[in-house]
From Swiss-Prot:
Keywords: Amino-acid biosynthesis, Aromatic amino acid biosynthesis, FAD, Flavoprotein, FMN, Lyase, NADP. This reaction introduces a second double bond into the aromatic ring system. This is Chorismate synthase. It comes from Rhizobium leguminosarum bv. trifolii (strain WSM2304). Its cofactor is FMNH2. Reduced FMN (FMNH(2)). It catalyses: 5-O-(1-carboxyvinyl)-3-phosphoshikimate = chorismate + phosphate.
């Protein structure tokens, strides 16, 4: 299986499976001289790890990251400095239950990658989905922690803005609320609504989709290039690579189809300090594939996980019709833990474009 690497200068290769002994990543192209502590990475993995509320999978993983290479340890025994060589990171799997998947060893779960993996490769890891499992994204979040160190002054934050048909009130957006509830919601009022709604979903053994929004602030103007190296193109590509993602939009996205040219174009004026001021940000901080200096705004939709208790029709590897019921521990709404994953992907895209821009223009933004 190829294509386990993304990025141009800031390159990330992930490895490992859901029920293997461990998974991890190698980050190549990270500049030397960046200083950090393990806790600077662990905070993002703790945000993604399973088992933190009744609304996510009850698989218990500590997701403790180990940095194996690419750094030198300071005298304090905690601070690490990147050397510019590949940074290898490892996360152990400790709570696999492969026996839960014995019945589907030869059955294709509807809506999963089982059929297409088997069709393409002639073999698949049925234990939790192998590489197609969202367990792989723990390694991406670790890589995203490194990416956040690359571009000075950039803050990447995400929030859950919709579960099923229940949307947040955007007028109530408060970043301080995001870390205060199990949904990463910026709207405190929607939390009890989501709790009641998801409790019903869980009780029925079903699942539901969601929308995640990621905003990157402090992004330097000038990142990205026209035509085939657009910043929004690469952000969309990385977000689409996340498990269960079925749609991505930048800025106003699909809502722009209902907007007039007068309302959609972001008008500009010159500020008193000689720096242009945008009067709106419908473009999501990117014009012509190049960052404007405004916040970069992206949203992505995740489908309901196909791992549900309802019996469904499918086929098996012998071409026979079968009825499949998925066992195991699964997220009733994968959008919750997709928040830190989306943050990591956007951070990696921005870090890569920052290094590419520096190499092409020589500018240190």
């Amino acid at each position: 299986m190829s294509h386990n690497t993304f990025g141009h200068l800031f390159r990330v290769t992930t490895w490992g499976e859901s029920h293997g002994p461990a998974l991890g990543c190698v980050v190549d192209g990270c500049p030397p001289g960046l200083r950090f502590k393990l806790e600077d990475l662990q905070v993002w993995l703790d945000k993604r790890k399973p088992g933190q509320s009744r609304f996510v999978t009850q698989r218990r993983e500590d997701d403790l990251v180990k940095v194996l290479s690419g750094v030198m340890l300071d005298a304090d025994g905690e601070t690490m400095t990147t050397t510019g060589t590949p940074i290898s990171m490892l996360i152990e799997n400790t709570d696999q239950r492969s026996k839960d998947y014995g019945e589907i060893a030869r059955q294709f779960r509807p809506g999963h990658a089982d059929y297409t993996y088997d069709l393409k490769y002639g073999i698949r890891d049925y234990r939790g989905g192998g590489r197609s499992s969202a367990r792989e994204t723990a390694a991406r979040v670790a890589a995203g922690g490194i990416a956040r160190l690359v571009v000075p002054g950039v803050t990447v934050r995400g929030a859950l803005v919709q579960i099923g048909k229940h949307k947040i009130d955007r007028r109530a957006w408060d970043w301080d609320q995001v870390g205060q509830n199990p949904f990463f919601s910026p709207d405190a009022a929607i939390v009890p609504v989501w709790e009641e709604y998801l409790d019903g979903i869980r009780k029925n053994g079903s699942s539901i989709g969601a929308v995640v929004e990621v905003i990157a602030e402090g992004v330097p103007a000038g990142l990205g290039a026209p035509i085939y190296s657009k910043l929004d193109q690469d952000i969309a590509s990385l977000l689409m690579s996340i498990n269960a993602v079925k749609g991505v939009e930048i800025g106003n996205g699909f809502a722009a189809a209902e907007t007039s040219g007068e309302d959609n174009a972001d008008e500009m004026r010159m500020g008193n300090d000689g720096v242009p001021i945008f009067l709106s940000n419908n473009a999501g901080g990117i014009l012509g594939g190049i960052s404007t200096g405004q916040p970069v705004v992206a949203r992505f939709a995740v489908k309901p996980t196909s791992s549900i208790l309802t019996e469904r029709q499918s086929i098996d590897a012998d071409g026979k019709n079968v009825d499949v019921r998925t066992k195991g521990r699964h997220d009733p709404c994968v959008g919750i833990r997709a928040v830190p994953i989306g943050e990591a992907m956007v951070a990696c895209a921005i870090a890569d474009h920052y290094l590419r821009d520096r190499g092409q223009t020589g500018r240190l933004k």
